[in-house]
Amino acid sequence: MKLYPAIDLLNGKSVRLTQGDYDQVSLTEDPLYQAQRLTDAGFAHLHLVDLDGARAQRPINRRIITRIREQTSAFIELGGGIRTLAAMEIYLTIGIDRLIVGSAAVSDPDLVEQAIARFGSNRIAVGIDTRAGKVATNGWLTTSQQTANALLTAMQQRGVTTFIVTDIAKDGMMQGPNAQLLADLQQAMPQATIIASGGVSSLADLRRLQTAGIQAAIIGKAWQTGAIELAMLKQMEG
């Protein structure tokens, strides 16, 4: 199983939020130290989120993201505040491997199609963040009327092949992922690569995702709190 340890950036620090609530910040750490720790542990993929950027609707933590990129050879995917081709160009130029478009996929789907035409489907993913069955946007501060299934279908028709799916109710709660939601989406779109995000708290959760047909997952609070030891995660990844 492909695993993406997560580093969420707020005011230049690595933090964890509970259910995406900016008022529920915990585990403030040095993101450079965390990135090095993950690299030293042998992880080949990192998931970065610019939380300030998601809220401001533009890139904010570019400096620290650049330093992380310079420090590690790992595959890095990045989301948060990426709403223009110019922003994508900047991040891809500094060596970010894949960009995650979230809110813009709802508000400006043509942008996603343009990005794929320009940069390739392997460099652009779409983040689908759901709350009570509807897609949330703008750093999860707004909820649209679009369902996850509808957005996934629409984006796949525009050339998207990789999706990061988060059930906000599960995020940061350490109570397990919404395996049923993920399984339903994967079964509906078997050609899509769906990366699970939110709620993973144990190796058993990862096995449940595998049983659901999901072959990649983002690990946030579980690795940062030590609920799952990095050595055990690496063993799970193989």
UniProtKB/Swiss-Prot annotation:
Catalytic activity: 1-(5-phospho-beta-D-ribosyl)-5-[(5-phospho-beta-D-ribosylamino)methylideneamino]imidazole-4-carboxamide = 5-[(5-phospho-1-deoxy-D-ribulos-1-ylimino)methylamino]-1-(5-phospho-beta-D-ribosyl)imidazole-4-carboxamide
Cellular compartment(s): Cytoplasm
InterPro entries, sorted: Aldolase_TIM, His_biosynth, HisA_bact_arch, Isoase_HisA-like, Isoase_HisA-like_bact, RibuloseP-bd_barrel
One Pfam family hit: His_biosynth
CDD domains assigned to the protein according to its UniProt record, in alphabetical order: HisA (cd04732)
Keyword Amino-acid biosynthesis: yes
GO biological process: L-histidine biosynthetic process; L-tryptophan biosynthetic process
Catalytic residues, chain numbering: 8, 129
Associated pathway: Amino-acid biosynthesis; L-histidine biosynthesis; L-histidine from 5-phospho-alpha-D-ribose 1-diphosphate: step 4/9
Enzyme nomenclature, EC number: 5.3.1.16
GO MF: 1-(5-phosphoribosyl)-5-[(5-phosphoribosylamino)methylideneamino]imidazole-4-carboxamide isomerase activity
Cellular component GO terms, alphabetical: cytoplasm
Source taxon at top rank: Bacteria
Keywords: Amino-acid biosynthesis, Cytoplasm, Histidine biosynthesis, Isomerase
Chief place of localization: cytoplasm
Gene3D superfamilies reported for this sequence: Aldolase class I
Family: Belongs to the HisA/HisF family.
Protein name listed in UniProt: 1-(5-phosphoribosyl)-5-[(5-phosphoribosylamino)methylideneamino] imidazole-4-carboxamide isomerase
